[in-house]
Amino acid sequence: MKVTVGPDPSLVYRPDVDPEVAKDKASFRNYTSGPLLDRVFTTYKLMHTHQTVDFVRSKHAQFGGFSYKKMTVMEAVDLLDGLVDESDPDVDFPNSFHAFQTAEGIRKAHPDKDWFHLVGLLHDLGKVLALFGEPQWAVVGDTFPVGCRPQASVVFCDSTFQDNPDLQDPRYSTELGMYQPHCGLDRVLMSWGHDEYMYQVMKFNKFSLPPEAFYMIRFHSFYPWHTGRDYQQLCSQQDLAMLPWVREFNKFDLYTKCPDLPDVDKLRPYYQGLIDKYCPGILSW
């Protein structure tokens, strides 16, 4: 079964790590022109219209029982081969290869942190939501807090939120909205997608990974925070301490993508060992 997930608007025009293959950086995350602009805009228009406090809470209720599927982490990785991600017109290969490429990039740069290697393998597994029938605007893309006014660095902020009912609700339409100053991102309701879902899967199944790993998974698509430097009014000191880890992971999130595919069969035993160490057995999804 193949499910079209793309285009993932958060993954368009991102650079490679290798400077020899990197393009002009001005062309990356370009939301003013380009062949994919219309469909990327449409994706964000749907996202920014429908991602409300009530919608996100309904998705937590819908998926919070973790009763959709029982499978191991490696089975979830293999399921990514059934996802057709149309966000990258230049490189066409299964998402599972990207998982291993990201993990191997981290492994090379941080050989002493095996838990970090596993984060690379895990980070996009929440995209199995697409196999459960979720629309792509509720699976992929940059994330943002609901329940408060969107900040300036949110993609298409000025042109896609007009029909979002929360912005007509005085509880949710101010800079702080329903939150207290510096309440901490752990008390913030994030827009629903593969980041938040995978974070919840990890918590429910009691992954024995360090807090940094949970932050990387939950916030790797929160570009308005880790790159746009917005939403500081919600951050606690713990969030600021974790921010360098999220940014470090961001270097490898798709930046390691290249047509030289890894030999997955040779890599599987190493990563299966990490799975057995940190998140073994059949998990609830």
Swiss-Prot record:
Pfam entry (one): MIOX
Alphabetical list of InterPro entries matching this protein: Inositol_oxygenase
Residues annotated to bind Fe cation 2: D124, H194, H220
Species this protein is from: Homo sapiens
Protein name: Inositol oxygenase
GO molecular function: aldo-keto reductase (NADPH) activity; ferric iron binding; inositol oxygenase activity; oxidoreductase activity, acting on NAD(P)H
Cofactor(s) recorded in Swiss-Prot or TrEMBL: Fe cation
Residue numbers of Phosphoserine PTMs: S33
Family per similarity comment: Belongs to the myo-inositol oxygenase family.
Tissue: Kidney specific.
Domain of life, per lineage: Eukaryota
Pathway terms, separated by semicolons: Polyol metabolism; myo-inositol degradation into D-glucuronate; D-glucuronate from myo-inositol: step 1/1
Cofactor mode of binding and number, as noted: Binds 2 iron ions per subunit.
Positions of substrate binding: R29, D85, E86, S87, K127, G141, D142, H220, S221
